[in-house]
Amino acid sequence: QNDTKRTSWYLSRRFGREDDIEVINFMNGGKSRSEIIQSGEKSRPQSNTWNPFAFSTEAFTAETMQSMLPQNVQGGEWQSRAIAMNKALVFGTKFWCVREGKTMSLQMLREHMTLEGMAKLYCRGLDDQWPEEAIAPLRNYLQDVPGFDMSLVRTPSAWTEEPRKQHAYLSGQFSETFTTFAETFGDVFAADAGDIDIRDSIHSDRILIVMIPALDTSAHTTSALGRMFVTQQSMLLARDLGYRLEGTDAQTLEVKKYKGSFPYICILDEVGAYYTDRIAVEATQVRSLEFSLIMTAQDQERIEGQTSATNTATLMQNAGTKFAGRIVSDDKTARTVKNAAGEEARARMGSLQRHDGVMGESWVDGNQITIQMESKIDVQDLIRLNAGEFFTVFQGDVVPSASVYIPDSEKSCDSDPVVINRYISVEA
C-alpha cells in the first residue's frame, strides 16, 4: 500500500531526514501499460530508477539473474545448464561494457541473450582481439550447444534448427521474468546508472523503501523481484567481509570503514513471499557487519513453501530476538514460538477437599502440590492478543509488549505534499 512510503517520508521530514528517502516502487495500481503508451503520457515514474547491474561485478550479476529463476520446480537439469549459459553471457557482456565504457543494464543483457546475440558478441571479441580469459566463456558455451557448428558462427542463416531449439530451452528459463521486468517495470529499471546505488544506501545510512506489488502480479514475479533485491543486498554485504590479508587494519578491514554508532536496520516484510536461502545466510553473517536484519511473516508455513523445513529451522535459530503477535491456531508457527520461549517450572494444586458444615459443604485446597514443566507462552495467550500487542522472546525471557501507536494526524500533513528525491545524472 502506498501509505507506507508516504508515512515514512512525513516521519523522516519530522526529523529532518527527508533528503535521505529513496524509493524503488514497482507498484502501478493496476494501470494498463498499453493505455499509458497509447495516451502518450510522459509523466515521471512514481519511483527512483534503479539499475541492479550498473556497478555489479560478473559474480554479482550472474547471481542476481540466477535469483530470477523459479524455485522448487521440475527441470533442475535445464536450470543448471541455463545457469552455465547465463555466466557466459554475463562475463562476455560485462567485459564488452568495461572495454567500451558502457553501462550494463537489464535491457542490454536481454538483447545479448539470444543465440545470435551471444555469437555476435563472440565474433566481436575475436575481431577486437579480446584477451583469451574474456572470450573463453563464450566460446566454451557455443561449443557445448548441441548441433552448433563453430565454423558457421558468423553466418546465422546457415545454422540448423537444433542449436536454436537447445538454446531456447535455456534462455526460456529467464524469458518470463525478463519480459515482465523490461516491459511492465521498464520505467523503474534504468538503462544508465540510475538513481539508486544500494551500497551507498547502506553505507550512508539512507532510508531505502522497496515496494513490491502482491495483488496485480503473479506469485513468481513478486518472488523474483524480492529475491533480486535480497541477492543484490547480500552480494554487497559480501564485499564488506573483505578478502585482503596483507596490510594494516585500515587497508584490509572493510567493515570498519563504515562502522557507525548503530547498526543499519533492514526490514524484510512478508518475507515468505520472496524467501531465498540467502536470507538464512545473511542472518548468520550480519552481526559482524554492523547490520540488523528484521524479518516479518504471517506464518512459518509460507516460508517453508519456498524452502525446506531444515532451512527454516536454521533461520529461526539465527534470529536472536523473536516477536510473536496474534495467531489463530496451534500450528507450526505457534510451536516454534513456544519452543523459543522454553519452559519453566510451575506449581499445580493436585486436588480439592470437601468439608461438610452446618451451613452446607465447602471446598478447600488439597494437601498435594505438583511441580510441572510448562511452556512460558500458551497458545491461548497468543490467540487473545489485540492489535499492536505481542510477546518478545529475548534470551529465554518472555516479555509482554506493545508497539508505539502514532495517530494518523501525526503521520501526514495535507499542506505539505510528498516529493520523490530526483537525481541529476553527471558524466564521470
Task: Please place each PLM-identified region on the residue numbering.
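Short hydrophobic alpha-helical runs that function as membrane-insertion/retention elements
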Residues: 1, 21-25, 292-297, 322-326, ...
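P-loop NTPase motor core of the ASCE superfamily
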Residues: 73-81, 197-198, 281-284, 304-428
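Conserved H-loop
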Residues: 298-302
